[in-house]
Amino acid sequence: MSGFFRKVGDSDSESDISSSEEELSELESGDEQPKTTQPAASRSRFLKGSDDDSDSDDDDSDDDDQDSLDSDDDNGERRTDGKKAPTSRFMKGAADSDDSDSEEEVKKVVKSAKDKRIDDMQTIVNHIESAQKSSDWTSINKDFDNLMRSIERQRTLNEQIPAFFYKAISQLDQYLNESAAKEKDAKKKMKAPVAKAMNGMKQKLKKVIKENDETIARYRSDPEGFEAAAEAALSAAAAPADAETAIAKGKKERLAAALDSDANDDFQTVGRGGRTETFTSEGLFKSLTAIMEARGKKSTDKNEQIRKLHDLSGVADSPYKKIRVILALVAARFDYNASATAYMPVEMWDSARKEINEIVALLGKNRSYVVREETEDYDDEVERVPGQNGEKDVVAVRGSIISFVDRLDDEFTKSLQNIDPHTTEYVDRLCDEKKLYETIVLAQGYFESQSETEALSRCTMRRLDHVYAKQDVIIKALESTLGEAAKTFESKLFPSAVRVAEQDGPAVLVRALCTYLYQARGVQAERPRTRAVLCHIYFHALHADYHVARDMFLMSHLQDAIQLADVATQILYNRVVVQIGICAFRNGLIKESQVALQEIFATGRVKELLAQGVQKQNQFSTVTPEQEKLERQRQLPFHMHINLELLECIYLISSMLLEVPNMALAGNDPELRKRVISRPFRRMLDYTDRQVFSGPPENTRDHIMQACKALQNGDCKACIELISDIKIWKLMPGSQEVKLMLAKRIQEVGLRTYLFSYSAYYESVSLSHLAATFDVEETVVKAMVSKMIYNDELAASLDPSANVVSFHRLELTKVQQLAATLAEKANSMLEQNERLLDAKLGEGKEQRSGAGGERGDREGGQPGGRRERRGGSAARGRGRGRGRAQQFQALGQKV
């Protein structure tokens, strides 16, 4: 029949044939099918004439075909009364064979239930990839749920999970991280339903990755090798009897190559039928050079580079080769993530950390090799052995270990900045800090053994950054996990882990780290030295050593030039000032605490100044997207944040204990009323006073405002109860001692406020009555009254015999108060007129200075001099130069 259809295909007839004939012809000959048919007579003549060139077998088959056609034509003529035979009669002879062929073809495409499940999963994965192109997170969520149900069915049936599932999970994780990074940088945020779907997808994907972390890590290290191995395993498990007819030849060849890769030493299968060179020790340098030349190019596959370098490290048979390959491998891992916002995958980060540990340990065992940033030129493709071929006793390899340590630490910080701090993922990631700390200590020991001063200073600063803001128990836990890192290199500059485990060990460690940085010399050491001082002060303030921290702060004179420092150092400076304020509050030094916190709260941007949040964008904002991006990169990880609610609570309570007596002292005196200690507190208090109805306190600020009102009314018990009910105290170390201290201070402030407010209504008052009213010891009352009299705050005198306080009436009358106000306004008008006169007569200033003048004579005989201001902002300390200088002056006062 094949010869028959080949000849019919050469005809020029014009009628169509059925689709079954096309399939049959495609299977038999592969030639183009006939489109039309001829009448029976002409068709038989054509076939007879065209059989001359065929062999005998073809002739026989053609004759048989012709006979069948003739008989069919005869039957057709009888049915159609001599008319032309229709196409269906021509197809009659081929119909039977077509039916049999179609049955065979149906058998070929029949798939098992297992294959159908695999195809369904592949279809779902394709849908997910299509939805990624349009960022349709709702569809991705739906398809992902269907995919996970299919995977669960596979596991229930104890069947192998296809490799494309792990590929899809890895690609989806990478796409999710990129989308999250773009969303942070985007000016226009995505819609709420899309963002909700994206966050839901993030949680689902995190759970799946955690359940399959080992398999996904193997896939990411060698994607194509993983797929080839999975296909080989799947083929071996299936082992169909008719593999040659059921599977395409190309796929069989790839599977056979994967199964027989050991038979050929020159090539190995990496997937998709591709082949790569098998790396050998002899060709290592050549392969390494080729890999390094491709580094940074746009078409370079970074995963493929990492896989090749990992294979090269396995065939390196000398320390020099091992060092060269690991240096290139770590650099390639850090090149994997080129984005400034997204962070390295955790698996990739951990692999880089292990390789850094490996190369440092290798350099520690082979002291004849060192890694330096600046070395003499050498041939990269030649083995270098110490003392041979013109080499020195110590072979220097070009590289930078400290840069790897810095990048590793930065990537760890970047990951903490991008992970949601309220999830378990953040806690799991934070547990990796002890591994990072071990790597830093190991590198620090190596730099100390090599006497590399600059690298040692940078590594010491990194170590200090990880301990200065932690409590003693956490520092001891970090030091206890060092293990081999402490044994590999014994340090003579810093205390051992055994010494740190003692009671004062953490303080000794921080002091040793800071002392080494203090002694560093050179311009490059200026920044680490400044940061070391600030870290040391922060550590003392964190441990409630207020006077030590204050003295170090003032003696360092950092406040004079901190505006010239970099932004990160200024952020650390702000954190130190705030921590000093908290430390003063814990020690009961209310005034010092308020002064330390005053400046940063006066700005209204506490969160931004402490790098714990970015400024909110509004119509008046001048922050560009680039500046906002830099601010986000400088944000501190969540576990290093200072609780802003606790900080505000401390500031408001300190302001309350200072402002309430000050407001009572001012009374109706217009001059004293201008003395404001805390303007933010005054604004909050005024807002509270304007409220028609005040409900029960709901937050920290409400508690403090109502406590302030109770204190103004002399109700100390209600004030103490409101302050004690604040829930944020549980975050304060030694909260019970702080509450007792505050109760005592509130009683004392209540007594002062009472005396200021009601002294005008008494001629004398008993000390015992005051002690009983405010629940204070009589000796304390006597001491407080004596101090108030000495400071001219209270016009009174003590009568020891009668044990009373006698008040003197020195209040101004209403006329006297109005006269004082008039004098003040007249003085201000005079000063304003003098400034206007100076502005108009500015061109004649030299003549007035030389010849004197009426105004100069009025100024005590000093020609041309300006009149000294009486009172005003200079006398009241309200000039623009207040702020930080006043703060440090207050910090330096004796307590």
UniProtKB/Swiss-Prot annotation:
Keyword terms, alphabetized: Cytoplasm, Initiation factor, Protein biosynthesis
Cellular compartments annotated: Cytoplasm
Compositional bias of kind Basic and acidic residues: 838-860
Domain PCI: 638-812
GO biological process: formation of cytoplasmic translation initiation complex; translational initiation
Acidic residues bias (residue ranges): 11-31, 52-75
Principal subcellular localization: cytoplasm
Chain intervals with Low complexity compositional bias: 884-895
Segments passing through the bilayer: none
GO cellular component: a single term: eukaryotic translation initiation factor 3 complex, eIF3m
Family of the protein in this entry: Belongs to the eIF-3 subunit C family.
Function: Component of the eukaryotic translation initiation factor 3 (eIF-3) complex, which is involved in protein synthesis of a specialized repertoire of mRNAs and, together with other initiation factors, stimulates binding of mRNA and methionyl-tRNAi to the 40S ribosome. The eIF-3 complex specifically targets and initiates translation of a subset of mRNAs involved in cell proliferation.
Protein name: Eukaryotic translation initiation factor 3 subunit C
Top-level taxonomy: Eukaryota, Fungi, Dikarya, Basidiomycota, Ustilaginomycotina
Gene name linked to the record: NIP1
